[in-house]
């Protein structure tokens, strides 16, 4: 609906860039559309805390960028957002504080940027988010670690 209010499920779906016919059966939606629908329903209730489990799964790059912007806005407005994800690029784009787990054990915690910058394994993802050039240099990492 083009006249849907911004805080409604239809308005939130439009904000996420997802066009879903109201009469469509949710089982006929793509995985990304279903995830966007669930998120829109959750947000329309205006919860004080938002829990997201692998929220970028099934989303295309554009929808992921929209979700990143929405999560940042919600956090800036004071909403607590707890995210479980394997998407390092998304975590780097929205996270302030991160807990890293391996085999069910907490192995590190700290600011997202510090944790990601401290591991060479995350260099490709960090390059996508933070590096001004297509190549992440030692100087880029040194600047992040300061």
Language-model regions, residue ranges each:
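Conserved ABC ATPase signature
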Residues: 25-29
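ABC-family nucleotide-binding domains
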Residues: 60
């Amino acid at each position: 609906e083009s006249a849907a209010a911004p805080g409604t499920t239809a308005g939130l779906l439009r904000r996420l860039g997802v066009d879903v016919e109201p009469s469509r059966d949710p089982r006929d939606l793509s995985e990304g559309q279903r995830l966007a629908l669930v998120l829109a329903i959750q947000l329309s209730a205006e919860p004080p805390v938002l829990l997201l489990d692998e929220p970028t799964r099934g989303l295309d790059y554009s929808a992921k960028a929209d979700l990143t912007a929405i999560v940042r806005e919600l956090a800036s407005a004071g909403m607590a957002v707890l995210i479980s994800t394997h998407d390092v690029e998304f975590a780097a784009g929205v996270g302030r504080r991160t807990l890293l787990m391996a085999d069910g054990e907490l192995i590190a915690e700290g600011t997202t940027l510090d944790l990601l910058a401290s591991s060479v394994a995350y260099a490709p993802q960090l390059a996508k988010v933070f590096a001004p050039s297509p190549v992440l240099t030692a100087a880029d990492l040194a600047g992040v670690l300061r």
